[in-house]
């Protein structure tokens, strides 16, 4: 085993004060806030307690700066963080032999990296139509830490929600969703590809005194589906098959032969195009491939840093090729006051574009209340924007989200179903597709205490009511107003009375029936009544058939004007009774034909006058009689 010929000179500063310590451990891994523990040893309890508990405990919240540097060579590594815990340890050990009892007199100063400021209270936040770079910038800005953000995924994300999690947990989940690197390098928070990665070559049995390689066969063929409602487009995309290089290509080839099926799940993120979905799947495929191979080792060089690249080589005398280049995803540094240093690291293939995720958390969103902030969908797709209670303080809302309805679909070029869009200010229940907080939709509306109306006594009424007062009421009260009523806010109604078996149509002004053909048919009686005028206009023929008697009563004058011929055919008698004068003016000829006898009787005087000649012809006898004299004059 190699000798530690180049010890490390460690330094710990707490609020600028150089601290003497017994030992130091710094644990670092991707997707974590890191953890350090500094142990200060005291010769006696008196010496330790003279520091006073108050002074020792006041170390909490101190700014910590830890530096590793080889005494003879190498670039120093610096880590900054905050003290979060202090433990004063005056504890008697329990050895196997009583005479070897030992009491420790130690103070443990424990802390995390700068990014712990992002890992505070859980909360909610939202981002609309943003890229990852914008989301990371806005989420981390209040903490005032240094951030380097260069994600490979540059698509615009319609809606992203931080859901009951700290900012750090939210960014962790975001990095997992989009398969982006996410780690703290000791000074800077990295999201995406780092601008530069420190590289170091490690020689086995010189720099590396323990080494382990691990290969695992995993399925890496992926596909996903997604529905884009704005364009009514269903996507199903496959990820690229990355064969990898070096040792990884061998492992992946074996895995592909073992697992010949393909994963098919919904997209991990809502996307707006098939190219964005393709980018996500390509990255996921590479990430899965990279997780098949890893190395683990122990070294005595502090140049092995998180996110850096290590290449493991073998002495030339062994004739073994290099194991390749690996990105450090975990490293634990240990050092004592004398500079005796070692670390334990884990690496995954650096030539793989994306690394194995070290995030194992998950979030499932549950339905919650919101208020409709707008229903003026710019694309007229029947969507709304809603505002959750937690969004009100920041004045935020969701993006345009769809509204669930009992029936919805399409018929040709138009939509079909129940088109009921909530109004601004309405309370709605919001659900999330797949439990994903980034995919909200309106499940339905709810009444508030000041707005709710029940179904009346016996819960017999079902009502559809619009904001202007139009309503349809279904009444199931068979002992009351059983039926259906359609009414507008002006009092126009259509009432279908189930109890009276009657339909009543009522209007404040006009009722207009307009159609190509209209038929009114009654088994018994049709009644028409007008309070004033009654007009009938017929554009063509007018026909009236009465199987029995017909009567017409006009209490005022009656005028009948016929521009064409007039014909009156009666199978029986015609009685004309006139209470006053009767006058018949004929502009043309008049012919009166009687198939039987005809008689004219007048109680008064009869005058017959002709402007032209008059002829009375009879095929039989003609009698002119008078009760008195009869005069025929010239």
Which residues fall in each region the model found?
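Short, Lys/Arg- and Gly-enriched loop/turn segments at beta-strand edges
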Residues: 72-81, 317-327, 435-445
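Surface-exposed cap/loop segments at beta↔alpha junctions
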Residues: 50-147, 159-160
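Acidic, low-complexity/disordered segments
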Residues: 306-374, 454-456
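Structural signature for extended repeat/solenoid scaffolds and their inter-repeat hinge/linker regions
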Residues: 310, 367-601, 605-609, 614-615
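Amphipathic, non-transmembrane alpha-helical segments in extracytoplasmic/periplasmic proteins
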Residues: 38, 111, 122-147, 162-184, ...
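Short, solvent-exposed secondary-structure boundary/capping segments
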Residues: 87-111, 334-347, 379-385, 439, ...
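Short beta-strand-centered interaction patches in the first periplasmic/extracellular domains
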Residues: 106, 113-115, 151-218, 439-443
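Juxtamembrane "anchor/assembly" segments of surface/extracellular structural proteins
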Residues: 1-62, 67, 114, 201-206, ...
């Amino acid at each position: 085993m190699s000798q530690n010929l180049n010890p490390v000179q460690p330094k710990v500063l707490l609020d600028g004060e150089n601290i003497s310590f017994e030992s130091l451990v710094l644990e670092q891994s991707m997707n974590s806030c890191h953890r350090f523990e500094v142990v200060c040893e005291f010769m006696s309890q008196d010496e330790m307690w003279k520091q006073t508990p108050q002074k020792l405990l006041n170390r909490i919240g101190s700014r910590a700066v830890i530096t590793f540097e080889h005494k003879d060579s190498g670039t120093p590594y610096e880590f900054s963080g905050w003290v979060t815990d202090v433990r004063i340890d005056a504890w008697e050990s329990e050895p196997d032999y009583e005479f070897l009892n030992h009491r420790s007199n130690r103070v443990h100063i424990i802390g995390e990296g700068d990014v712990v400021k992002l890992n505070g209270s859980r909360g909610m936040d939202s981002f609309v139509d943003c890229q990852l770079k914008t989301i990371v910038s806005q989420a981390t800005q209040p903490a005032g830490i240094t951030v380097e953000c260069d994600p490979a995924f540059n698509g615009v994300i319609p809606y992203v929600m931080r859901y009951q999690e700290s900012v750090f947990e939210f960014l962790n989940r975001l990095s997992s969703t989009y398969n982006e690197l996410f780690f703290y390098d000791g000074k800077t928070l990295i999201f995406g590809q780092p601008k530069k990665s420190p590289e170091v070559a490690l020689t086995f049995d010189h720099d590396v005194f323990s080494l382990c390689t691990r290969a695992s066969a995993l399925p890496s063929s992926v596909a996903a589906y997604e529905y884009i409602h704005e364009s009514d487009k269903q996507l199903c995309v496959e990820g690229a098959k990355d064969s990898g290089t070096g040792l990884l290509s061998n492992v992946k080839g074996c895995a592909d032969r073992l697992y010949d099926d393909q994963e098919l799940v919904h997209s991990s993120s809502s996307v707006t195009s098939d190219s964005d979905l393709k980018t996500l799947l390509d990255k996921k495929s590479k990430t899965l491939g990279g997780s098949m191979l890893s190395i683990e080792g122990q070294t005595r060089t502090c140049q092995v840093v998180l996110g850096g690249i290590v290449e493991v080589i073998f002495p030339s005398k062994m004739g073994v090729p290099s194991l390749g280049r690996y990105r450090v995803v975990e490293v634990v540094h240990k050092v004592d006051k004398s500079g005796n240093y070692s670390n334990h690291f884990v690496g995954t293939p650096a030539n793989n574009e994306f690394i194995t995720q070290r995030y194992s958390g998950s979030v499932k969103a549950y339905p919650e209340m919101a208020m409709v902030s707008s229903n003026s969908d710019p694309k007229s797709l029947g969507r709304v924007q809603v505002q959750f209670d937690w969004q009100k303080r920041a004045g935020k809302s969701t993006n345009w989200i769809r509204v669930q309805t009992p029936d919805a679909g399409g018929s040709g070029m138009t939509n079909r179903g129940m088109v009921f869009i909530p109004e601004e200010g309405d309370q709605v229940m919001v659900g999330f597709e797949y439990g994903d907080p980034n995919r909200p939709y309106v499940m339905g509306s709810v009444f508030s205490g000041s707005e709710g109306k029940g179904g009346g006594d016996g819960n017999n009424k079902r009502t559809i009511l619009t904001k202007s007062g139009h309503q349809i009421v279904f009444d199931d009260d068979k002992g009351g107003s059983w039926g259906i009523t359609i009414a507008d806010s002006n009092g126009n109604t259509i009432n279908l009375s189930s109890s009276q078996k009657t339909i009543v149509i009522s209007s404040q002004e006009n009722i207009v029936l307009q159609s190509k053909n209209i038929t009114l048919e009654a088994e018994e009686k049709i009644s028409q009544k007008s309070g004033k005028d009654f007009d009938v206009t017929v554009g063509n023929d007018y026909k009236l058939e009465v199987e029995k008697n017909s009567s017409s009563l006009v209490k005022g004058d009656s005028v009948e004007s016929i521009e064409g011929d007039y014909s009156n055919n009666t199978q029986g008698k015609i009685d004309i009774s006139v209470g006053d004068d009767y006058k018949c003016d004929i502009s043309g000829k008049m012919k009166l034909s009687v198939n039987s006898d005809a008689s004219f009787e007048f109680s008064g005087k009869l005058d017959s006058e002709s402007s032209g000649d008059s002829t009375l012809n009879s095929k039989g006898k003609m009698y002119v009689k008078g009760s008195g004299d009869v005069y025929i004059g010239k």
